[in-house]
Structures are given as structure tokens and as C-alpha cells.
């Protein structure tokens, strides 16, 4: 059984929601990313979403774009991130999902990317800009290596939700708003109607993300989904430039505050 399925099954039995935490791999550096992942797990994260830095991340807001640029400026390569996951796997069995742009996968080679991801211990991929027409090719290779291609749907893609969720695995990443990522004070999309629509097409667990800024918002949204994705609000804390110990402490405290409400 894939680690993602196992985690959602366990959470369901416990009556809890999944806390999915996003960070950019290599920001501020690979060794610190390793420490952050272990700190996130310790604080109660259920799934780690590792962003592979990309020079033109269309779905990302300024916080994650800046994070990507910092990692790229350090010369981070996909191979470094594969090695990082291998290191994490020596210590942890937490589900790990890459958030990666299609061009990065294509340039690396679809088959090689999925084979290396499997060997490293990756459980799933989210490819936010994957064209629907390329989906089958990636899906076939992902299935071969038993890696889940996690569908990402948005409120604007109603007519495409069926096509995007078809054959998806793991969970559906439901974007709460149109536009780019980033912590917000409030979310104005009619989420109840949106989540009903997604549920009409798939019985997979659904996680809400994009714009979730803290525990108050997570508390309000948890009844609508099976999990919450928090990214920019964590990346902001990593970027503050504290010394390593202070930063890890603040990230852990923030994630603990999210875990408590879920």
C-alpha cells in the first residue's frame, strides 16, 4: 500500500484531518531542508510536499517564487533533491510528494524522473502545469513505478475536474482560489459548492490548499475536506533569516498550532 493511502486510512480511523506541509527543497540549503522535514514530522505533519525549484513557477505567489530563486541561486539540482529524499528515508517513513513543474520532468526525462523518484522513496507527484493531453503518458510511467500522480483542480476548471481526477491517485489537491499561492486573510470562493462538485466526480480524499495562513483558517476549512495544505505561511517563516535553531523552533510551533485544530 502506498504511504499516502496508509496515512489517510489511519487519519480516518482516528477522526483527524491530514496536515500537508509544503516547503521548497534547497531553501535555505539542502542540509537545512533535511532538518525542516524532520521537524515538520515531529510537529505533526502527515505528508510532506517538497517543491522542486523552478525558474518560472506559474502557480506560485511571491513567497514561494522567492524561495525557489534562493534555492536555484545555491545551484540546487534535481539529483540533490533525490539524494535528500534518500537521506530522509533513512530516518522517516512520512509520505513525500514532489511538487514539480512539467518542464523539469520533461527535461530530466519522464521515465528517468519517475524511476529515480521511486528509488529515492517518493510517493507522489503534483504537476500543476501538466497539460491534460500529456497526462496519460506521465500517468502510465507513474503507474509503472507505483508513484501516485495527484490531481490538482481549481474552482475555474469545473468542466475539466472530471478529466483531471480520472485515474488520479492518493488525494485531490483542491485549490481554494484562482490565481497563485500565498497566505491570505480570507478565502472568498464558494468552497462548499466547489467541494460538492469535486466529490461528485471522485471518492478520493480531498485536500484544500492555496492561501491558508494559519490555524484559524484551517479550523474554518477542515469540515469541508479530508486535509489542509499549508505552504507559503511556512516558507515565510523559513525565509525570516533567523539562525537555524530559532527558525526550526518557529516552524515547529506554527505547525503544532495547525495540528492542534485538525
Curated annotation (Swiss-Prot):
E.C. no: 4.2.1.20
Name assigned to this protein: Tryptophan synthase alpha chain
Amino-acid biosynthesis listed as a keyword: yes
Pathway named in the protein's UniProt entry: Amino-acid biosynthesis; L-tryptophan biosynthesis; L-tryptophan from chorismate: step 5/5
Classification via HAMAP family: Trp_synth_alpha (MF_00131)
Coiled-coil residues: none
UniProt similarity note: Belongs to the TrpA family.
PANTHER family per UniProt: TRYPTOPHAN SYNTHASE ALPHA CHAIN, CHLOROPLASTIC, TRYPTOPHAN SYNTHASE, ALPHA CHAIN
Catalytic activity: (1S,2R)-1-C-(indol-3-yl)glycerol 3-phosphate + L-serine = D-glyceraldehyde 3-phosphate + L-tryptophan + H2O
Subunit structure: Tetramer of two alpha and two beta chains.
GO cellular component, one term: cytosol
Keyword terms: Amino-acid biosynthesis, Aromatic amino acid biosynthesis, Lyase, Tryptophan biosynthesis
Annotated CDD domains: Tryptophan_synthase_alpha (cd04724)
Organism expressing this protein natively: Caldanaerobacter subterraneus subsp. tengcongensis (strain DSM 15242 / JCM 11007 / NBRC 100824 / MB4)
List of catalytic residues: 49 (proton acceptor), 60 (proton acceptor)
UniProt function note: The alpha subunit is responsible for the aldol cleavage of indoleglycerol phosphate to indole and glyceraldehyde 3-phosphate.
Molecular-function GO term, any one: tryptophan synthase activity
Lineage top rank: taxon: Bacteria
Amino acid at each position: 500500500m502506498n504511504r499516502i493511502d496508509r496515512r489517510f486510512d489511519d487519519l480516518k480511523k482516528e477522526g483527524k484531518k491530514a496536515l500537508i506541509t509544503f516547503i521548497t527543497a534547497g531553501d535555505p540549503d539542502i542540509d537545512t531542508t533535511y532538518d525542516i522535514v524532520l521537524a515538520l514530522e515531529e510537529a505533526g505533519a502527515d505528508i510532506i510536499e517538497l517543491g522542486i525549484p523552478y525558474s518560472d513557477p506559474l502557480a506560485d505567489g511571491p513567497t514561494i517564487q522567492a524561495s525557489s530563486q534562493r534555492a536555484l541561486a545555491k545551484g540546487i539540482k534535481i539529483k540533490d533533491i533525490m539524494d535528500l529524499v534518500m537521506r530522509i528515508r533513512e530516518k522517516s517513513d512520512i509520505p513525500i510528494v514532489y511538487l514539480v513543474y512539467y518542464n523539469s520532468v520533461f527535461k530530466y526525462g519522464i521515465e528517468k524522473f519517475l524511476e529515480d523518484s521511486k528509488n529515492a522513496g517518493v510517493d507522489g507527484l503534483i504537476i500543476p502545469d501538466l497539460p491534460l493531453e500529456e497526462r496519460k503518458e506521465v500517468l502510465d510511467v507513474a503507474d509503472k513505478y507505483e508513484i501516485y500522480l495527484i490531481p490538482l483542480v481549481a474552482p475555474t476548471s469545473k468542466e475539466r475536474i472530471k478529466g483531471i481526477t480520472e485515474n488520479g491517485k492518493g488525494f485531490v489537491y483542491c485549490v481554494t482560489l484562482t490565481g497563485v499561492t500565498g497566505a491570505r486573510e480570507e478565502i472568498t470562493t464558494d468552497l462548499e459548492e466547489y467541494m460538492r462538485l469535486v466529490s461528485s466526480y471522485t471518492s478520493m480524499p480531498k485536500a484544500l490548499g492555496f492561501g491558508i495562513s494559519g490555524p484559524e483558517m484551517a479550523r474554518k476549512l477542515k469540515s469541508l475536506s479530508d486535509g489542509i495544505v499549508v505552504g507559503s505561511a511556512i516558507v515565510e517563516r523559513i525565509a525570516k533569516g533567523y539562525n537555524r535553531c530559532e527558525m526550526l523552533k518557529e516552524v515547529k510551533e506554527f505547525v503544532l498550532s495547525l495540528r492542534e485544530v485538525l
